[in-house]
């Protein structure tokens, strides 16, 4: 992480109202292994994002005095295996975060492209954190199969969010995403989160709502198994406890989809743990999802993963992991490999 002072805020400038700084930071992650999704063929790959999707970012803050400050964040994903930006073809340049904000003693407000509170809770309360290659909780939340999984991305465009101060370990966040067009009056998303942390215990409660874009049923194109999807609501409860010899995570999620001719409801649970050693951690995680309702096909999915993460230094680690992923009616998915991650 590299910090530097903006040219106009040197200590010798008598007219400077407040100190400002900009920080450059990021993570590079490369992975070599075998990847097979349920129902798909096996591919031997060298790619990015085994444990963390690679990204770089710039953040800045200006102290305005009396407990107030302004800030900004710009973050861009990249693929270290081929040098392209984004997570996939067509992804935006600053697709991780892009916002400005104001912090005060009464909380903070941000506006722009924002990471959702649901995503932050999902990666905070599972042993494999934000791994889009190995984390079962990520897969059951954001990489659903059939009628399962959350609609949309882990970031929302045209969004505004408020985060409260922390009182006794408790704080809250509310987020709203605008349709930004007079021709799509139905387009909006919103979510709320309550978080609590006290010593070794932490917990989070999330609710997220996504409405149709312009006419009822048009977001169904996002999920082929749910034609005519009109709206979706997601409730997620997570908790963790650090026993020092092992950190345990648990989560429950309900996703309820309203479609033109019926409903689909998916209940998901996960349990995972991380066993720390002096320079390493053993990771294990299990997630299960079961769908019901007239449009659900009673789909079921079971995913588990184990991994070993070894620290070379405070910034760099090596890892190896294996994931088993079974979705009803499809051949089992198996993914395994080794990787390296470094922070700057």
Region spans (language model):
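Cleavable N-terminal export/targeting peptides
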Residues: 1-21
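Outer-membrane beta-barrel "beta-signal"
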Residues: 332-344
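Transmembrane beta-strands of outer-membrane beta-barrel pores
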Residues: 30-36, 76-80, 115-117, 176-180, ...
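Solvent-exposed loop/turn segments connecting transmembrane beta-strands
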Residues: 151-157, 178-187, 259-265, 293-300, ...
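Repeated loop/turn-to-beta-strand initiation elements of outer-membrane beta-barrel proteins
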Residues: 68-70, 106-109, 169-172, 200-205, ...
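Detector for outer-membrane/organellar transmembrane beta-barrel domains
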Residues: 191-305
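Outer membrane beta-barrel
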Residues: 19-33, 43-178, 186-188, 195-202
